[in-house]
Amino acid sequence: MKDNQEQAAPIVYWRIDEWFPDLSPDLRTRLKTYHEELLKFNRTLNLISAKTVFVADALHFADSIMASQAIMKSNPSLDKIYDLGSGNGFPGMIFALLYPKVQVVLVEFDQKKCEFLNHVAGVLKLSNVTVENRTIESFPDGSMKYVMARGLANISKSIMMTRKVVPKGGVFYHLKSEEWGIEVGDIPTQLCSVWAPSLVGEYKLPIGAIKFSVVKTDKIA
């Protein structure tokens, strides 16, 4: 009876090959390797929520692929970008895999998560990735022209955190849900005189009906 009572282990999906056939076989293999390393280290580091483990291919990988493509399409001359609060490597590690000519700096305060990021960058042989184990505020003023973040904070808090490190003319790309307009509406008036928000792109994941968005804030003063 024991065998009948035991429930089958949930399936951990991997559908990137099916969803993104335009990506090269080598790139899809490296994405799968990243997925395997993520699940292995997640047992001790809590890199992603347990609820998302089985559909990480959609909620983390596909989301980061589509967001990265939207960012690059809007700014094809991009040559360096900072991923703030990188933690599990989304979207920065994915961005680096997709665009090997772009230098990607993963900024993370947690040392153990930085060790994970360095490990993955090494396994994937990503020479365009640098991991910085430090706070955002510790970077020199005006040193980050292009930055992005996924799950760091709401837009208001994110631009407050980077008000010194992002120079005039710099851009912050925020990965958000379809309710991004609420966050934009909550930006204090004094910040709106310094940062100009706009929508870069919207997309739906290969599963589900929820829209995801990339919103940018241009630093205008």
Swiss-Prot record:
Pfam families: GidB
Catalytic activity: guanosine(527) in 16S rRNA + S-adenosyl-L-methionine = N(7)-methylguanosine(527) in 16S rRNA + S-adenosyl-L-homocysteine
InterPro entries assigned: rRNA_ssu_MeTfrase_G, SAM-dependent_MTases_sf
Domain of life: Bacteria
Binding site for S-adenosyl-L-methionine: G85, F90, I136, E137, R150
Broad class of the protein's primary localization: cytoplasm
EC assignment: 2.1.1.170
EC main group: transferase
GO cellular component, one term: cytosol
Keyword line: Cytoplasm, Methyltransferase, rRNA processing, S-adenosyl-L-methionine, Transferase
GO MF entries: rRNA (guanine-N7-)-methyltransferase activity
Subcellular location: Cytoplasm
Family: Belongs to the methyltransferase superfamily. RNA methyltransferase RsmG family.
Function: Specifically methylates the N7 position of guanine in position 527 of 16S rRNA.
Listed name of the protein: Ribosomal RNA small subunit methyltransferase G 3
